[in-house]
Amino acid sequence: MSPTAPISRFPVPELKDLPEDIRARILAVQEKSGFVPNVFLTLAHRPDEFRAFFAYHDALMDKPSGLSKAEREMIVVATSNANQCQYCVIAHGAILRIRAKNALVADQVAVNYRKADITPRQKAMLDFAMKVSQQSYAVDDTDFAALHAHGFSDEDAWDIAGVAAFFGLSNRLANVTGMRPNPEFYAMGR
């Protein structure tokens, strides 16, 4: 990978040219993380879609839930692997390493969650997320029963499905735009 390769096949706007709310959000992320994740710059190409994307992202990923933030990131990483999304596997793999405080599990989930050192509850969660991601038309009562057997509520099932479905959108946008992972993600949480 050449460090000078473009981060997107679409135009990436200059910060100074962005609407104030988007510029403020990007600068806040930069302040917190020390860099600007390329997803922000890539999606800023379409400000209205940027706002809608991050509003839904935040509603799913930041709210109180029966799922921990690490578990939500597990869903992102496992389903992004199935969707062959390099950007999301690398970026959210980094976030998972930090949230789970376990680089080994994060890498295991990124490659094959079925062999990862995770709990049976988390495996059931990821089995459901993968079915939503790859075969949503086949989800039925037996899938909900498997979640219930591990202590998940119907609201938790909605959260699992929401994260898997949202990141299906994100994976497809990242793949189509040719979004490149920031080099900073590779070392985070290691």
Predicted regions and their residues:
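Hydrophobic alpha-helical segments
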Residues: 1-190
